[in-house]
Structures are given as structure tokens and as C-alpha cells.
């Protein structure tokens, strides 16, 4: 990842070692400034990133607030902020990605590169939005609000700190818990995870095995990982956002928030890019087809199946009781991981999920649909109904001779539901 472009280094004392390392990594130009001039430097330079070189609090709280506001409200591509910190201290700016000052400078550069990859992706999305608007005369519906609202953090642990960690994390993030590394691995494959906390209760060998799984999968290259206890140093190069932390839950949450927000923002950008590349066919919130596109695709599939005498089945997944917005989104995103390549689906207006199985008869569709419903039931989170079991029901219909799009939809919306096991 290229680091070219102006970057501001904020420090009241010379930060020669860090500046030299940045220069060697390809950062140019580097603008050094003191805290008193940081706001003016940000406005004048319009940097690609801001680096807080000195650990500890900002010397002036008002300056820190103003600089934070300037960075957060800057138009165009995001400006990552990375701050050196001591131990489990919080960063000088609340929006800054923390980097332990006691670690080698190479670790700092790796975290900077990770953040700059997100900035580059954001720039690509903004360009595609402009192109989309020029050619189509409209903008697709794009997600808004804090990306942290989309985030899910996985806590793996079974020691005495696990309950406190769960409470602290649950107050700030959507959270998944795992009492074993095997369960944690299942969650990673089934859900969109934006941060991982490896808690106490695991042997060093188990922790190393789990981190090895993360390091070998490019999907988890930039995911924030907080390891309570000693983190093996071998993973620093492949996992730039791995940290060793102590067991204080509140400090851990404060350290994780900026990193998790950045990762969730990256995931949002990837969904938006998919939407733009397909001219608005996919919903950037769920990753499934939009409702209108699903209707068009199903209409074509019905006509094609009728002409070629091939099978076509349709499933509707509904849930007992009202779903909150987060649970509805989680179930839809989970479906994107379970759907077969030749099938397609969407989220309906009431939160139910529609899934079309092409070239699949009723018997085969029944097997696949029940498996999907069972996985949704097991993995979906409903924070407002934490004590209730989520019952996912499946309604199935298959194409018959003389069927049309409307008749098939009427049957799947009104036929008898089969409760998922």
C-alpha cells in the first residue's frame, strides 16, 4: 500500500525516529507541527493521515476537540488518525487508532498501511458514486450513520474475566461469545466480525493456533485483535491490528472502539462498491439483491424454467415476533454467506428473507432451506429478546405447469410454514 501524500506528525518534541521511519516507508511530504499549530496545519495541508507521535493526553483539551472535529467533518475521503499510546492508555484523540509506543516502529507503519488501505477503498467508492450519478442520473441508497452501529465483536474466552468483558463489550458493540476456539472459528465463518477479543482461560498453544487461523486467511488480515495476556510476536507482520492488552474491560473497550469502527467502515465500503459495480442491483446494507431487482430476476427465472422445463423453487424465511433493525440486518447478511452461487435472494419489507433456488426441485430445496433456517436461528442475534429462542420458519413453493411470477409469489406468501428444526 503506497503511503505517498502529505501526512501531519503532531508532537511538541522532535519525533526523529518516527519521522525517519515514515520517510523510509515512502511517506512524502511529512509536515511536522506542534499541538498549538495542529488545527491550522490540518486545514492548510489537507493531509492523507494525521499521526500523533507523543503518547499521552493532548496538552490542550480545546485544541484536541477542535482538531477532532476538523478531521471528523472533513469532506471527501476519510483521514485516518493514528496515535502512539503507552500501555493501555487512551489515545490523545478519541477517533485515533491506538498504536503501542513500546512496540517497534515497523508495527506502527503496518497499522498505518492498514488504515490507508481503507482510505484508498473509500476514495474508490466516492469515484464510483460520481460515475454512477453521471450515467444513471441518480444515486443508489447508501448506508449512513456511524459504522460502529453495524459492528459485531467476537469474544473468545472462558476464564474469570469473561463475564466482565461480555458486559463491557455488550454495552458498546453487538457481541458474540465463544467459550472455545472451535466455536469462535464457526462464528468467524458464519458472521461478519469486526473485532476479536481473545480472553483468558486458554492455553498459549490454543491462542497461537487460533491466531494462526486468522493469519492464514486474507479475510482477517486487517481485523482488530486484542489478546489478553502475552500475544505471540510472530503474527505482527500479518495481523497489523493485533494488540496485547491487560484485563481491564473499560480500557479494552476504549482501545477497541476506533479500530472496530474502521473495520466496520471498510466492510460497509465493500458492500457499497458491490452495489455500484452492479448498477444498484445489490442492497449495500445487506449484500442481497434489492427487492425490485429480486422481482425482476425471479420473473426471468420463472420464464426460463417454463421454457426449458427445469425446476425452480422459492423459499420465504420468516421469524416469530417483531425483529429489530439490527437482527433483521444480521439475518440478511448471514444469508449472503449461505446462499449458493446459482441462487439469489433479498430481504422483504417486513424483514423476512426470500430465496430463489434455480434448477432445484421441492425435495432438494426443502433440505437446503431447512439447513439455512437452522443456521439463521442459531447465529442470529436479537438483543431486545435475548432470553427468547429465535424460531425461523420456512415457507416453500415450487414452480408448476402454468405458473407465473405472481402465482408463485402468492403461494410462497400464503402456504403452510414448516418450522425449522
Locations of the language-model features?
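Active-site-proximal structural segments of metal-dependent nucleotidyl cyclase/transferase enzymes
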Residues: 295-322
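Conserved nucleotide-binding and Mg2+-coordinating catalytic segments in signaling enzymes
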Residues: 276-296, 317
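Catalytic-core segments of nucleotide cyclases and related cyclic-nucleotide turnover enzymes
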Residues: 362-370, 397-421
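Non-catalytic signal-transmission and effector/linker regions of two-component phosphorelay proteins
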Residues: 1-28, 43-44, 72, 110-152, ...
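Conserved helix-loop-beta segment at the catalytic/binding core of cyclic-nucleotide signaling proteins
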Residues: 281, 332-365, 374, 378-383
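Conserved phosphotransfer microenvironments
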Residues: 34-39, 48-76, 85-87, 194-221, ...
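Alpha4 helix (beta4-alpha4-beta5 surface) of REC/receiver domains from two-component response regulators
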Residues: 20, 58-72, 79-106, 208-209, ...
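Receiver (REC) domain switch/output surface
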Residues: 104-136, 238, 248-268, 272, ...
Amino acid at each position: 500500500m503506497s503511503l505517498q501524500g502529505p501526512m501531519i506528525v503532531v508532537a511538541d518534541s522532535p519525533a526523529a525516529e518516527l519521522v525517519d521511519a515514515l520517510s523510509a516507508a515512502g511517506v512524502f511530504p511529512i509536515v511536522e507541527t506542534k499541538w498549538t499549530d495542529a488545527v491550522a496545519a490540518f486545514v492548510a495541508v489537507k493531509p492523507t493521515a494525521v499521526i500523533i507521535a507523543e503518547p499521552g493526553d493532548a496538552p490542550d483539551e480545546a485544541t484536541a476537540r477542535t482538531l477532532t472535529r476538523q478531521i471528523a467533518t472533513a469532506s471527501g475521503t476519510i483521514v485516518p488518525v493514528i496515535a502512539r499510546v503507552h500501555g493501555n492508555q487512551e489515545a490523545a484523540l478519541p477517533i485515533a487508532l491506538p498504536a503501542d509506543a513500546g512496540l517497534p516502529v515497523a508495527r506502527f507503519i503496518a497499522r498505518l498501511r492498514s488504515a490507508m488501505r481503507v482510505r484508498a477503498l473509500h476514495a474508490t467508492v466516492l469515484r464510483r458514486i460520481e460515475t454512477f450519478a453521471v450515467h444513471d442520473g441518480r444515486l443508489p441508497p447508501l448506508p449512513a450513520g456511524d459504522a460502529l452501529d453495524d459492528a459485531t465483536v467476537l469474544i473468545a474466552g472462558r476464564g474469570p474475566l469473561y463475564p466482565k468483558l461480555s458486559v463491557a463489550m455488550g454495552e458498546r458493540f453487538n457481541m458474540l461469545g465463544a467459550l472455545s476456539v472451535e466455536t469462535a472459528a464457526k462464528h468467524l465463518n458464519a458472521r461478519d466480525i469486526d473485532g476479536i477479543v481473545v480472553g483468558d482461560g486458554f492455553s498459549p498453544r490454543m491462542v497461537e493456533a487460533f491466531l494462526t487461523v486468522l493469519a492464514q486467511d486474507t479475510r482477517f488480515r486487517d481485523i482488530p485483535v486484542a489478546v489478553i495476556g502475552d500475544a505471540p510476536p510472530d503474527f505482527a507482520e500479518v495481523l497489523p491490528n493485533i494488540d496485547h492488552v491487560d484485563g481491564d474491560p473499560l480500557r479494552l473497550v476504549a482501545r477497541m472502539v476506533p479500530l472496530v469502527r474502521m473495520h466496520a467502515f471498510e466492510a460497509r465500503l465493500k458492500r457499497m462498491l458491490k452495489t455500484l459495480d452492479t448498477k444498484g442491483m445489490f442492497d449495500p446494507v445487506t449484500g442481497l439483491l434489492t427487492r425490485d431487482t429480486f422481482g425482476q430476476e425471479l420473473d426471468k427465472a420463472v420464464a426460463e424454467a417454463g421454457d426449458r422445463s427445469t425446476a425452480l423453487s422459492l423459499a420465504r424465511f420468516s421469524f416469530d415476533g417483531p425483529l429489530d433493525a439490527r437482527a433483521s440486518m444480521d439475518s440478511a447478511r448471514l444469508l449472503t454467506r449461505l446462499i449458493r452461487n446459482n441462487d439469489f435472494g433479498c430481504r422483504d419489507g417486513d424483514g423476512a428473507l426470500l430465496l430463489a433456488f434455480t434448477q432445484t426441485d421441492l425435495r432438494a430445496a426443502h433440505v437446503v432451506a431447512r439447513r439455512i433456517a437452522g443456521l439463521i436461528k442459531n447465529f442470529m442475534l436479537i438483543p431486545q429478546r435475548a432470553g427468547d429462542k429465535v424460531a425461523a420458519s420456512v415457507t416453500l413453493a415450487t414452480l408448476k405447469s402454468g405458473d407465473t411470477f405472481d402465482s408463485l409469489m402468492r403461494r410462497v406468501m400464503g402456504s403452510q410454514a414448516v418450522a425449522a428444526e
